[in-house]
Amino acid sequence: MAAGSAALIFSCASASAIESNYKASSTSSADTVWSKVGGFCGIANWHPAVAKCELSHGNKIRTLSLKGGGTIVERLLRWNNKGKNYTYMILSSPLPVTSYVSTIKVVAKGTGSEVGWTGKYKAKKGTSDADAKKVIDGIYKAGVDVLAQ
């Protein structure tokens, strides 16, 4: 059902979807960077905007408490430990986006690695595409830069 949910969101959002993509290189191995990612709630250990993460519903739902206030609730759609990536969707958040589906991925590059965060979403009513993209791009950059260190 989760994969079907992601497919439905992508098919509904594809005509006007906004895309964000941020990558950074690391001198650390892909295994080392992936270990920094941690589990689905590992984001609280590396993203500077996340104060706390709590798992529920069989570890498929995470609730992020943000350092500046606010809460984001996300559903894990796919976890691929061997492929060093996971995909999730936002269920509720104060962010200016809807229909949000995203993937965090780590790949080996020579003796180092590359960590990337990509997403597709729509701007909430009353928010320009450019403003929504600026917010998501900033979130991705802040997180990826920490993981790549």
Question: Positions of the model-derived regions?
Answer:
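Hydrophobic-ligand binding "helix-grip"
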Residues: 67-114, 120-124
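Hydrophobic ligand-binding cavity/cleft-lining segments
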Residues: 10-56
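Residue-level signal for tight coil/turn positions that link beta-strands
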Residues: 28, 57-59, 83, 110
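Bacterial N-terminal signal peptides
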Residues: 2-11
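Hydrophobic pocket/interface hotspot
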Residues: 32-37, 43, 62, 76, ...
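A conserved amphipathic terminal alpha-helix motif
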Residues: 94, 114-116, 120-149
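Extracytoplasmic/secreted proteins, especially bacterial periplasmic and envelope-associated proteins
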Residues: 28, 32-35, 42-45, 71, ...
